[in-house]
Structure formats: structure tokens, C-alpha cells
Amino acid sequence: MLTQHSNIDCYVSTFVIRIVQKSGGGFDLTFTNPQNGMFHLSCTALISAMGCRERTDRQVFIHGDRPSGVFTAGQAQTFINLKGYLPGKRFVILGSGDIGLIMARRLTLETASIGGSVEGVYEVKSKPSGLTRNIVQCLEDYGIPLHLSTTVSALHGTGRLEGVTVTQVDGQMRPVAGTERYIPCDTLILSVGLIPENDILDSLAPVMDARTKGPQVNQYMETTVQGLFSCGNALHVNDLVDYVSESGSIAGERAALRCLRAGFAGNSALPKHPTDISICA
């Protein structure tokens, strides 16, 4: 590992439970882990690289029963790739994010020998969210139907999921009466978006971007809090890991320069009105 050859201490199974900005600059952090209990470290520069988390069924307001058999796409990946378990046999996938599309293909292949199937992918928007290559390679090549402007409106089942109700929506994403359909299934996979993970930074109060849900940064990946950098999916959700690596390299270099007192100082390069700058989505 890189840390073994660079004299870097690496703490695993360790949680940051508190971050305090020091009056003279830098940060005090409180950690906890099974080996050391609670302990403290100080630093001159801090990089937020905490990634993002998946939205759950409670965050997309699906009504009905609360049976087992409802998983996020990341949970399904963990069961199959790391634990060797199949989460179900007949699947409905809500959302057309890249992870959901990849899981549609994977579930089709994994359940082919036991008669399983992916009943369809349902997307509330009028356009798919994932990359075109994943639409082609994961859905079209395997004959998996994609239903746009359609969402899962209710769950049905006692104990285990038995089926879902899907409903078409209008341009304002309101359910269209009379379009409800019942789809039998035992597993619902949610691929309904990712949210940058920044809750631990609340005590530092960096200015957050309402669109990306991550901190506002300058070209050096430094936030409005001096010495605090952000990169990867903690900054904003990236489609490609190449962009994650690029932002991480910039943040790491600039954080190191700040520690050496040789880097750019202050936040003068931060736009004064970043919300007025158009972005390509």
C-alpha cells in the first residue's frame, strides 16, 4: 500500500466525531476506534474526501407497506460482489442512475440459471440519468425495458415484498390518475441518486452549494473555510472516477503546500457570486 512506503499513519475502523477550527489556524479532530478508544489529532490542513451516500426509500416518499426486500443499488452490489448472496429473484429497479443500470445487467446474469428476471427499470424523469453507454450495454443489450416518466408509488407485501404499484407522472412529476399498474416482484432496487456526505463539517460552517450539495471551492479545491479542502464525491457527485482522482490530486497538493507554508494563502480566488456562474449539468 502507498501508506506503507510514505510514512503516513493510516487508521482503519476509525470515526471522526468532532472537528473544531483553532483560532490560530488549523483544526483539532476527535476520533474513536476499538484499538485506541477516543483520541485527538491536530492538523494545519484538512481534506474532506468522504464520498457520498445513497438516497433511501424514505427520501423518495414511496407509500404502502414496509416489507423486507427493498435495497439501494449499493446494498445489492455489496450482497452480490462481497458476500455472494442474491438479494432476490424478481426485481424492479427504480431510477436509472449508473449503479442501477449496472445492477440490472448483473442481476439478469446472476439469476438466469434460477429463472429470475429484472421486470423493468422505472425512471421518474423524462430522460434517463445514467450514461448512454450503460443504457445500451446494460439494458438494450439484455432486453430490459426502461420506462420513463414512471415511478414506484406504493409497496405491497407482508413480511417480504410481493409487488409494487407503478404510476406515470406528468411534466411536474405529479402522478397521473388511472395509470397505476401492479408489478409482481420480490425485490425493489433503488437507484435514486447520491448525496455528498458532509454532515461532519457542519461545525466548520463552509458555504454549501445548493445545487451540488457540496461545499463551494476555488480552483485549488479549498472551501470558504481556510485550510479546509474538498474533493471527489464529497464535493459533488462525479460520473467518472477519473474526475474524482483529478480533484483529489489537486486538493492533496494544495493541502501539502499549505502545510509547508509555501502555497496560495487566503480565499481571494473564490468567486464572490459563484451561484451566478452557469454550469453544464
Predicted features, each with a name:
Residues 1-90, 169-178, 182, 189, ...:
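FAD-binding core/adjacent interface of flavoenzyme oxidoreductases
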Residues 2-5, 11-31, 108-199:
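A Rossmann-like FAD-binding core segment of flavoenzymes
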Residues 48, 70-80, 187-238:
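FAD-site-proximal beta/loop scaffold in flavoenzymes
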Residues 52-54, 98-99, 195, 235:
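Residue-level detector of alpha-helix initiation sites
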Residues 59-62, 104-107, 200-203, 242-243:
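Short amphipathic alpha-helical segments
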Residues 75-128:
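Rossmann-like NAD(P)H-binding beta-loop-alpha module
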Residues 79-83, 128-135, 218-221:
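Short, charged, surface-exposed secondary-structure boundary motifs
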Residues 231-277:
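A conserved FAD-binding loop/helix module that cradles the flavin
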